[in-house]
């Protein structure tokens, strides 16, 4: 039985294998076909069936082999299919437009609006309009005033239907076409679009087609066509309403464009996605119709509908959520189960409580009861998501509760301790709270309470509130006042802080013999109003504040305040005024780094509304140094709260530890306000007074130093002649005595009276009066480059013969900016860039018993001799002309920083220099000043900045012209000044003057560019030669590769044959030998090389010719970077060399 069953299973398996061999059985009845396998299995021999199965298996293997072979063939040479897909598959479809379509055109102007009367009116937000205006700025208006462009129209008070509201300039390019269609394919297409978008069967009566083609912006150059804007508005008028179809073909730029619908009530409007943003370009790529760039809208009476019932979203691609239904899912469900049909809004189980009617949208009157809110609550009507009114109650600010039952006050001061500033006081009131800064602090009380003008005094000791009250205060730390140590002070209500006994408290300060401080001495009556408080404090904040004030004004950062006595007069009056004065006086004790005990008084006036003849001052024990404050004793004393002596309005600071008081912090400041400095610079006198001329004395021969570039001349007064040590920047003249000793004795015997020209070393050369010192503090500001002052020395008259007569004795040139000084040795400061030089030149003075050469002889007898001496001196100075320096002008590159440079030349350059000044008879002080002017030219380029334009393609945005100032710096040539003493001039060498340097400048201006151009030409020629050589080598190499095949090139050799040199004939023999080997014939298929087979890095047995891929069999081997130079590398080759 098991054998029979096995036999039946094999028969069934054979039946499945032979289904393709018995096609004739398909025509037999189905029942016979099921019985036939069983019958055949019982009648036929199983061995024959097994043999048939083996044959069928062989056939199946053969079919599989052929199928695999077919796939391999397809893999070796696949069929290339090129598919070009453009995304998106659909694009916006503009209606036909232009003159060929029968359109009319707007004029080529700016802000154009064309009036058009329609056949059928447009329904827009519940109103019908038969007259519209076609606007060039990308909209359809319903009013004549809508043609003017203005931004922010959504929302606004003007009715618009705007596909793309933008400022277009038709004068710059672009056209606007429009036409009204009442029949034809346009109406049919509009009808089908409406039916597809809203599932409504409507009949289109007319259509208005408006096309804005290639719009250009305003105030810019014309953009390329791909950057222009092209869009269309198709308005379909039906019996069931108006539909608007916006079609965007190309959006290339925007200037804040907007798209949408505006009802004109400044509230109701509809904006397209990305309207008013730079992303408005995406209107071309998206749409709510399923086609990019096409948007369809239904203009109903109340609002604009974008999607059909059951759909919502900007692009109408979302279904309504639970509880929503209708177009744009704008309606809410009022069903008992909470959900309704998304299209019709039907409720399967009925409406919810208080709702009935179609789709449960009617609210019952019994549910419309008004709710009574609690006290301190606000009742208002709110709207839910569906726009339905809901009455709500809410507690007012400062109260908590539900608003319907109760609203309790919130105590913010208890619930939040940090709600006010730490220096403020919190006060709670019903529904509110207040933060008030403490006394002595000012601010909003919540975020800021900084220390006020006056120091805090609300906790200080107060004087009795009566007239003429006093208080004696014993100091915890004694104060040094007016040179004496004080331990007790008396404070009176009349505004006095006295050190001595106060005998009377009325009259004037000068009559009271008072020693102390009077911040505001007046008829103050505390019994009427105000208060006076006193306290000695050591608070850190107070001391830090006064320390900073004193350190900043007295230039002593080491001063530290240790204690302060604070006396405050708060809102004090004389009994007749309604508004009182408030001021404060601080006596500050401290010391500096030298442990010097210092005391200051700081008077601070906040409010001084009344005066009544009051006085203010500091009365020292030395009456001559007492200080009365400005306007003391007058009605103008109220100005103390606005003025100051430390540049802080209302604050006056004085140092009082010494008997001699100083009205200002610095001795060079001008009292009483100390807001400017004393002028110590002399004013140049217009002429020398007669009494001053008599005291003038000519200086003795000596050395005159070349001054440093600080615009200061410091003449040296020298008595007698001597040896002068020569140094750098010192012009030294060696002179012999004017007369011998015998001549001096002879001339001294003459008794005729004569003027005395002698002088003492301590007497100044020039005497100036007080009015000559009237220069401002900025008189010494250097506004030009430094200059060099050359002062030649005097020569004795017997140095050279042949003199020129001079009948007039010139006076020295006193063109200086600082007072003259007398000194035996003068230090000459040098600039950092100059070379090292002796700081001063020692000068030997004449002995006191030696007589000056100018004192010998009488006036009458020496008149002729004196003139001869002057002529001799003049002629002696003539000998220095060959040694006088010269100012050389060297053109320098333009200095963009605007700073002129002073360059010092060497001694060799000084030999060719000449001085341009003339020497005088006795002493000539000549100043040569050369200024390098810097001219700054400022040019303003007016530009008109166009509005910002967003261009959405690769076209670059036009650049706005810059409105910044352009500065052209014109720099004069720098001055080269000699810095070394001149040597003996060589007459054979030519003199180089300024004119010659100017002649050289044009030549250099031409020569330098020519040399630069020649250098560049040489570089270019070299580069061209290198490039040509490389191209020639590459061309020859390519010819060889074409002749000998792809295998031509550098070939690696085995290590064994490394030292053996082979020839071209050896390669030919090897090629002939290899060509006769049949084992390698398959590998040589398709080769064009004459050198045999390609070499491989692996044995030949691993690479069967039949299994090589196309790339392996056809691509030449790579000879790049295979380590050919490494002698230790060994290769295995498929070929035999």
UniProtKB/Swiss-Prot annotation:
SMART domains: EGF, EGF_CA, NIDO
S-S pairs: 413-426, 420-435, 437-449
Signal peptide per UniProt: 1-41
Composition-biased stretches (Polar residues): 738-749, 798-809, 978-992
Keyword rRNA-binding attached: no
Glycosylated residues (UniProt): 240, 416, 571, 756
Domain EGF-like: 409-450
Entry membrane topology: Single-pass type I membrane protein
GO BP annotation list: amphid sensory organ dendrite retrograde extension; cell-matrix adhesion
Gene: dex-1
Name of the molecule in the record: Dendrite extension defective protein 1
Positions of region (Disordered): 738-765, 795-856, 878-897, 906-933, 978-998, 1106-1125
């Amino acid at each position: 039985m098991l054998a029979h069953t096995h036999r039946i299973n094999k028969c069934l398996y054979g039946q499945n294998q032979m289904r393709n061999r018995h096609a004739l059985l398909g025509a037999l009845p189905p029942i016979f076909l099921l019985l036939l396998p069983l019958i055949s299995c019982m009648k036929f021999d199983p061995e024959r069936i097994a043999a048939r199965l083996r044959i069928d298996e062989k056939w199946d293997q053969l079919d599989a082999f052929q199928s695999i072979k077919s796939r391999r063939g397809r893999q070796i040479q696949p069929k290339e299919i090129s598919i070009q897909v453009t995304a998106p598959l659909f694009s916006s479809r503009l209606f036909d437009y232009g003159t060929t379509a029968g359109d009319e055109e707007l004029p080529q102007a700016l802000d154009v609006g064309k009036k058009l009367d329609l056949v059928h009116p447009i329904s827009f937000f519940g109103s019908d309009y038969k007259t519209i205006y076609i606007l060039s700025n990308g909209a359809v208006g319903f009013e004549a005033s809508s043609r003017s462009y203005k931004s922010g129209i959504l929302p606004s008070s003007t009715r618009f239907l705007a596909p793309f509201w933008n400022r277009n300039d038709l004068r710059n390019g672009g056209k606007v076409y429009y036409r009204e269609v009442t029949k034809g394919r346009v109406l049919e297409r509009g009808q089908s679009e409406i039916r597809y978008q809203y599932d409504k069967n409507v009949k289109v009566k007319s259509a208005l087609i408006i096309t804005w083609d290639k719009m250009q912006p305003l105030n810019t150059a014309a953009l390329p066509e791909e950057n222009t804007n092209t869009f269309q508005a198709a308005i379909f008028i039906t019996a069931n309403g108006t539909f608007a179809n916006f079609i965007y073909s190309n959006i290339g730029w925007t200037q804040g464009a907007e798209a949408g619908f505006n009802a004109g009530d400044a509230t109701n409007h509809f904006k397209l996605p990305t309207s008013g943003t730079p992303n408005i370009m995406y209107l071309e790529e998206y749409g709510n119709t399923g086609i990019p760039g096409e948007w369809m809208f239904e203009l109903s009476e109340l609002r604009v509908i974008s999607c059909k019932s059951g759909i919502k979203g900007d692009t109408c691609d979302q279904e309504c959520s639970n509880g929503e239904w209708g177009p744009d899912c704008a309606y809410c469900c009022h069903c008992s189960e909470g959900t309704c049909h998304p299209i019709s809004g039907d409720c399967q189980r009925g409406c919810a409580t208080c709702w009935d009617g179609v789709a449960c949208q009617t609210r019952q009157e019994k549910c419309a009861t008004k709710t009574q809110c609690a006290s301190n609550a606000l009742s208002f009507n709110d709207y839910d998501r569906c726009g339905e009114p809901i009455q709500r109650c809410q507690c007012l600010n400062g109260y908590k509760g539900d608003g319907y039952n109760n609203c309790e006050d919130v105590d913010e001061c208890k619930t939040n301790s940090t709600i006010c500033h730490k220096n403020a006081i919190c006060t709670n009131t019903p529904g509110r709270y207040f933060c008030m800064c403490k006394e002595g602090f000012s601010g909003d009380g919540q975020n800021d309470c900084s220390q006020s003008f006056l120091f805090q005094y609300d906790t200080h000791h107060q004087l009795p509130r009566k007239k003429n009250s006093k208080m004696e205060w014993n100091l915890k730390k004694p104060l040094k006042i007016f040179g004496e140590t004080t331990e007790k002070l008396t404070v009176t209500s009349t505004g006095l802080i006295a050190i001595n006994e106060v005998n009377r408290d009325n009259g004037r300060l000068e009559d009271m013999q008072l020693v102390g401080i009077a911040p505001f001495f007046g008829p103050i009556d505390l019994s009427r109003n105000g208060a006076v408080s006193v306290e000695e404090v050591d608070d850190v904040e107070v001391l830090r504040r006064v320390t900073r004030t004193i350190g900043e004004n007295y230039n002593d950062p080491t001063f530290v305040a240790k204690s302060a006595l604070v006396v405050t007069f708060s809102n004090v009056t004389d009994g007749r005024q309604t508004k009182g004065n408030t001021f404060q006086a601080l006596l500050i004790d401290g010391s500096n780094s030298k442990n010097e005990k210092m005391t200051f008084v700081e008077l601070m006036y906040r409010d001084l509304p009344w005066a009544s003849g009051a006085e203010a001052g500091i009365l020292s024990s030395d009456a001559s140094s007492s200080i009365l404050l400005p306007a003391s004793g007058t009605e103008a004393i109220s100005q103390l709260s606005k003025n100051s002596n430390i540049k802080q309005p209302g604050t006056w600071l004085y140092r009082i530890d010494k008997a001699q008081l100083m009205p200002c912090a610095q001795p060079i400041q001008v009292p009483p306000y100390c807001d400017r400095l004393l002028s110590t610079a002399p004013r140049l006198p217009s002429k020398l007074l007669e009494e001053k001329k008599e005291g003038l004395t000519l200086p003795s021969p000596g050395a005159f130093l070349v001054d440093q570039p600080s615009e200061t001349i410091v003449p040296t007064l020298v008595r007698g002649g001597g040896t002068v040590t020569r140094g750098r920047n010192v012009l030294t003249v060696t002179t012999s005595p004017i007369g011998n000793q015998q001549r001096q004795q002879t001339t001294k015997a003459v008794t005729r009276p004569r003027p005395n020209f002698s002088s003492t070393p301590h007497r100044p050369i020039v005497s100036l009066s007080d009015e000559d010192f009237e220069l401002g503090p900025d008189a010494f500001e250097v506004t030009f480059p430094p200059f060099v002052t050359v002062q030649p020395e005097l020569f004795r008259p017997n140095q050279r013969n042949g003199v020129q007569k001079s009948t007039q004795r010139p006076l020295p040139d006193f063109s200086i900016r600082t007072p003259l000084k007398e000194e035996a040795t003068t230090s000459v400061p040098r600039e950092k860039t100059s070379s090292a030089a002796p700081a001063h030149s020692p000068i030997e003075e004449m002995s006191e018993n030696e007589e000056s050469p100018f004192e010998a002889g009488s006036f009458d007898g020496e008149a002729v001799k004196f003139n001869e001496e002057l002529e001799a001196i003049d002629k002696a100075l003539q000998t220095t002309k060959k040694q006088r320096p010269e100012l050389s002008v060297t053109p320098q590159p333009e200095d963009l920083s605007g700073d002129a440079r002073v360059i010092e030349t060497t001694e060799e350059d000084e030999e060719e220099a000449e001085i341009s000044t003339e020497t005088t008879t006795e002493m000539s002080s000549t100043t040569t000043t050369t200024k390098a002017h810097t001219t700054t030219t400022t040019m303003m380029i007016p530009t008109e900045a166009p509005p910002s334009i967003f261009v959405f393609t690769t076209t670059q945005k036009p650049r706005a012209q810059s409105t910044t100032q352009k500065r052209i710096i014109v720099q004069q040539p720098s001055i080269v000044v000699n810095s070394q003493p001149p040597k003996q001039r060589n007459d054979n060498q030519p003199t180089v003057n300024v004119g010659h340097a100017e002649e050289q400048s044009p030549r250099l201006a031409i020569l330098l560019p020519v040399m630069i151009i020649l250098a560049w030409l040489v570089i270019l020629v070299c580069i061209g030669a290198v490039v040509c050589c490389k191209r020639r080598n590459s061309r020859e190499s390519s010819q060889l590769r074409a002749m000998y095949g792809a295998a031509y090139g550098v070939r690696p050799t085995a290590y064994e044959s490394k030292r053996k040199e082979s020839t071209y004939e050896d390669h030919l023999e090897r090629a002939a030998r290899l060509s006769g080997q049949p084992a390698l014939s398959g590998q040589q298929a398709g080769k064009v090389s004459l050198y045999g087979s390609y070499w491989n890095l692996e044995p030949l047995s691993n690479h069967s010719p039949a299994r090589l891929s196309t790339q392996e069999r056809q691509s030449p081997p790579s000879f790049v970077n295979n380590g050919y130079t490494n002698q230790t590398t060994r290769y295995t080759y498929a070929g035999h060399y």
